[in-house]
Amino acid sequence: MIQRAACFSPNSVEKDLAILAAVAERLQCKGHQVEMASEESLTAMGYDIILSMGRLPETLAWLQREQEQGARVVNTPEGISNCARSRLLSIMEHIGTPIPPQEGLDGYWLKRGDAAAQSKEDVVYVQDRESLRQAIVDMAQRGIREYTVSAHVKGDLVKFYGVCGTGFFRYYYPTDDGQTKFDDERWNGSAHHYSFDVQTLQGECERLAEAVGVEVYGGDAIVRNDGSFCLIDFNDWPSFSRCREEAAEAIASLIKIKM
């Protein structure tokens, strides 16, 4: 099991470690030998199954080599790479995932495009086009020249979590429990709990997960007041902090299927 490098766990290092530990505990209880490693200490050992939260380029290259040698990898290096925002947006557009429009009257979101967010500055809300242009300049000065832009969508912010092939899917309103990474939830305000079709959301998420190539996933959606929704974020192997024990059971079940 590969831990996620701290740079990819902003404000979430302990939570990310906790989900791996919970999965490891369940696999060990089933009689499996489990080893934990950091992204910085990987060596080729001929493992049968590798569970990885890693995102460093070196880690993905290592996973690719292990996969070519016959190891089963969750999530695959290809899938993890596809979660970089620019690639992800291209896949979403290709398969028709409901996403925010590029233009709107309620502000814009500028997001780092070459990798997952590593700091608060990688995901920025601005109120108008002039502010957007300056935010792009600021991001470029940090060495980031690949980015995505989308219009802000009003509605309930929903965080979702899933494990493909197990039926596991959960969603939560972060403003209900106050758990936050960068406090970006404030731009949508407290949840109104608009009614929407959960099965349709799950179906869209699983369809995207298949297209991206990840089996353990999470993300964010906005539910509008008419019940329609759009996906605004999708990522490989979240911390599952709101449903850790259930998620660990589901991930362990997924591994059993692969054995």
Model-identified regions with their sequence ranges:
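Conserved N-proximal alpha/beta basic substrate-recognition cap immediately N-terminal to
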Residues: 3, 7-101, 116
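A short glycine-rich, hydrophobically flanked beta-strand micro-motif that places a catalytic Asp/Glu
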Residues: 37-39, 147-149, 158, 214-226
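A short beta-strand motif that forms the metal-chelation/ATP-contact edge
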Residues: 47-51, 111, 160-162, 227-242
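Short, solvent-exposed loop/turn segments at secondary-structure junctions
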Residues: 56-57, 79-81, 115-116, 154-155, ...
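Conserved anion/nucleotide-ligand pocket segment
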Residues: 108-134, 138
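Anionic group-transfer/hydrolysis microenvironments
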Residues: 113, 152-153, 161, 220-222, ...
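Phosphate-binding site of ATP-dependent enzymes
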Residues: 126-212
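C-terminal active-site "lid" helix and adjoining low-complexity regulatory extension at the edge
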Residues: 210-214, 223-259
